[in-house]
Amino acid sequence: MQNTSPRKTRREIGHIAFVVPDIDATIKFLSSLGIQMSLTKSFNPKIRTLFRGKEVNWDCIISRGNLGAIGLELIQPTGEGTPYDQFLKMTGGGIHHISLKGLDIKEEIATMEKSGAKVFSNASIGQDIVATYLEVETIPGVVFELLKGEF
């Protein structure tokens, strides 16, 4: 194991995203714990998404809230063959990604790729919002999202 001094970082967790089969039931459960999801929005195929080099639909419902300083995002796929639909079918749901904020996206992609991460998906919502997803072989099952803009 390599022993290195921790470097100062400007990275912060923006949110942790969960793919769920029933967003309404999940919101109801979280509400019973005092966790309020304040924004729910439907997305449709008009969003340009590249997933493993192929253009795919991004049909889903997303709800956002907070648990203290950490944002929570719930995602329910509503279309067949979307990245979230594939994840739900493979895993039954669960943590999909950790979103990092406060970054220069291009610089962060270069830094993460230099460290072994691989971009596997990009989504654009208009001109102002871009989400880039990266996998890291040394942390199987963990996906990082770099998000530019907010919806």
What are these regions (language model features)?
Residues 30, 71-76, 84-88:
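A generic structured-segment signal
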Residues 24-44, 88-93, 103-126:
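Extended intrinsically disordered, low-complexity coil regions enriched in Ser, Thr, Gly, Ala
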Residues 1-51:
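Long, hydrophobic N-terminal alpha-helical segment
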Residues 37-40, 48, 54-73:
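Short, well-structured hydrophobic secondary-structure segments
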